[in-house]
Amino acid sequence: SAASDGYKRQQLCQAMEYDIECKYLSLSRYSLRIPEFHLMKEQCVDRICLGGIDVTFEKVMKRAGLTDAECLSIAKECGYKDSMHDILSYSTIMELKPVLRSNKHFLKMVYSHSEHAYSDTISYLRQEGLFDGLSFAIADSGWIGSIQQSLKNLIHSVNPSINFEGYYFGLYDLPDKASASNYHAFYFGPGNHILRKMRFCNCLYEAVLSAPEGMTVSYECTDN
């Protein structure tokens, strides 16, 4: 099971005594994207500049893993010093992409934080057996399948021969260039069950079925 949304599914799997080993991975989009960014180079800006609800310049910088001081520094360079907390429209966020992509100072900060987080993240995945040579799949709530893509990129940075598939409650869409054969949805998928999507509230779903602990933000090695 992947991330907090896989919490209840892992419990159900264990209760039904399926003949499969089921582990709970503590991860999130954020905890995987930060160490992934330096592998993506300038393409990481596409992950950082995503639309959403109540997106501000500060939130965009936090997605990149920047500190408060670094956020302010880039805000000054990009002309957002006095509007860091203003809500950005989707079109404004898209216009921000080329600005950040061409800002070497910003990218240097992003890569630095990413490289710092990379080693412990890989160590955690290794600790959980993802490099042991066994076949595995991930189970998650779904929505756009980006966790699977980030997890794949991190794993392939160590061993490109490791492949796995994802099983989801529902998928609205797939990541760019993702192979549909590696993504399996139960309740609705990218090209079907429009009515189910209209009636479904993923916020309620997550509120009811998520794990009791907070979101995983990073990994740290302790006591060797």
Regions found by a protein language model. Name each.
Residues 12-15:
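Domain-level signal for soluble alpha/beta catalytic cores
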Residues 40-44, 55-62, 69-224:
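Long, contiguous domain-sized segments
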